[in-house]
Amino acid sequence: MHTLLWHLYWPQHLGGAAQHIFADAEAGKACIHVPTVVVAEALMVAQKGCLPGVSLDRLLRHLRAMADSDNYPLSPLLPEAVIASHAYTIIPDIFDRLVVTEAIACNIPVLTRDPVIQQAGLAT
């Protein structure tokens, strides 16, 4: 979730590789799969008022634009992914665990700085 929010609102927090990947997606040269659970978590955080300077309406506009774009397909949260996530209990946060499970199932990298996911060797 952090990577997506940083891209939308605080790109200076992204590393160079992430900035390049997002730039490629914006230019139509790459595709970034956005797990539905990331959208749900971002909405939850915005509703709680935990994103300084970001209103829920503003976030919804960004998310709708991404959903309408071919460059940011939303991947559904399927029961199979939820069940398979039990194998990744090394990741304590359920949202992060579901993101990793989905990425592994789709054979796509996880774009994150999360140290737990990185230490588990499950991130790019």
List PLM regions with ranges.
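Active-site regions of enzymes building and remodeling cell-envelope glycoconjugates
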Residues: 121-124
